[in-house]
């Protein structure tokens, strides 16, 4: 029931936001007055109002003394207002217009930080989500943007934090590849699984996912009858990752059963067309390390960018099981996520 309440609150908040009138800015304000009001809004954490006034300042006084600073602070205001796309667009514009600005490294940093938090939306603050299973597009963008910052401004005050986040993001991307490899194993697409495991080993060295990638290779090669490759991969796994979850008392334990009960259509399409259940949760050391690193990274955000403390009390309440009610739900109940039974 808790999830239903959260969804209802989100819908009502969105409706209220869409129906409310946009804030109007007094046209008689001078440049300095408008800038000072925007600063007051930022200090009061009224980020939506600050965005409106900073945009008005830039449009009314494009060549004023505060124009460049307003563009820079607009990135920050959008980021704090939980509008990552707007923050990234504002950062790209500032970088394009002012590549030699003394604070352009701040624009690069906020651009990467916006992508870093892009997947952590409203529901993600309350619902338990495994970041290693989500679309890695934003993570790749964030990694590349932080890489630009550290390469162009190695002495920037934001470089150390960016490097730490890059380590986390690299581990996240590696763990995602491991999940894809497990998915291929579940679908019995063993060639694809072996290739994915080898990709992890070759491209994500020094990440916790390498051991899991080797385990995928061992299992896939065994299923393909490539015993020599399987033995080589297993010896490497035992030597470098003796505590991997796939090893029990030094012996390799496969995660998937040998039986192939799929239909001919499922086999012909490598499991893409099949009405079976989704792959089960695969607990890996890489996934656990990535989740811990994300939590550590959140605590290391500089003070001026540290998000407000959120109330996570909703996390402690587990939703009641609705399994017994699902069979009698109407199509309208499914369409509204059960809000209107």
UniProtKB/Swiss-Prot annotation:
Belongs to the BamD family. Its main location: membrane. The keyword Nucleotidyltransferase does not apply. It is found in: Cell outer membrane. Residues 289-330 are annotated as: Disordered. PANTHER family: OUTER MEMBRANE PROTEIN ASSEMBLY FACTOR BAMD (PTHR37423:SF1), SOLUBLE LYTIC MUREIN TRANSGLYCOSYLASE-RELATED (PTHR37423). A lipid is attached at residue 18 (N-palmitoyl cysteine). Keywords: Cell outer membrane, Lipoprotein, Membrane, Palmitate, Signal. The lineage of its organism: Bacteria, Pseudomonadati, Pseudomonadota, Gammaproteobacteria, Pseudomonadales. Residues 289-316 have a biased composition (Basic and acidic residues). Part of the Bam complex. Residues 1-17 form the signal peptide. A lipid is attached at residue 18 (S-diacylglycerol cysteine). It comes from Pseudomonas aeruginosa (strain ATCC 15692 / DSM 22644 / CIP 104116 / JCM 14847 / LMG 12228 / 1C / PRS 101 / PAO1). InterPro entries: BamD (IPR017689), BamD-like (IPR039565), TPR-like_helical_dom_sf (IPR011990). Residues 317-326 have a biased composition (Acidic residues). GO terms for cellular component: Bam protein complex. It is a lipid-anchor. Part of the outer membrane protein assembly complex, which is involved in assembly and insertion of beta-barrel proteins into the outer membrane. GO terms for biological process: Gram-negative-bacterium-type cell outer membrane assembly; protein insertion into membrane. This is Outer membrane protein assembly factor BamD.
């Amino acid at each position: 029931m808790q999830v239903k309440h959260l969804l209802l609150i989100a819908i009502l908040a969105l409706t209220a936001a869409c129906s409310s009138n946009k804030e109007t800015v007094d046209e008689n304000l001078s440049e300095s007055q408008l800038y000072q009001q925007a600063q007051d809004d930022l200090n009061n954490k009224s980020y939506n109002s600050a965005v409106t006034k900073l945009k008005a300042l830039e449009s009314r006084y494009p060549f004023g003394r505060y124009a460049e600073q307003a563009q820079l602070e607009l990135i920050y205001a959008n980021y704090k207002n939980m509008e990552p796309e707007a923050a990234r667009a504002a950062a790209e514009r500032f970088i394009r217009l002012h590549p030699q600005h003394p604070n352009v490294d701040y624009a690069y940093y906020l651009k990467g930080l916006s992508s870093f938090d892009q997947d952590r939306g409203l529901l993600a603050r309350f619902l338990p989500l495994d970041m290693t299973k989500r679309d890695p597009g934003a993570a790749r963008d964030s990694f590349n943007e932080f890489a630009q910052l550290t390469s162009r401004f190695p002495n920037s005050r934001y470089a150390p934090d960016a490097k730490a986040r890059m380590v986390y993001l690299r581990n996240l991307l590696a763990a995602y590849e491991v999940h894809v490899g497990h998915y291929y194993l579940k679908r019995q697409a063993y060639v694809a699984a072996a290739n994915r495991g080898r990709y992890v080993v070759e491209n994500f060295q020094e990440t916790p996912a390498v051991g899991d990638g080797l385990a995928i290779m061992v299992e896939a090669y065994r299923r393909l009858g490539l015993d020599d490759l399987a033995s080589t991969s297993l010896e490497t796994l035992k030597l470098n990752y003796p505590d991997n979850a796939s090893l029990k008392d030094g012996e390799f334990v496969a995660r998937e059963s040998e039986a192939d009960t799929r239909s001919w259509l499922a086999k012909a399409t490598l499991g893409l067309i099949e009405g079976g259940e989704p792959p089960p949760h695969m607990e890996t050391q890489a996934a656990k390390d990535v989740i811990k690193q994300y939590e550590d990274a959140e605590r290391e955000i500089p003070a001026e960018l540290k998000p407000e403390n959120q109330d996570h009390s909703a996390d402690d309440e587990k939703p009641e099981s609705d399994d017994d009610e699902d069979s009698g739900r109407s199509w309208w109940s499914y369409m509204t996520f059960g809000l209107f039974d």
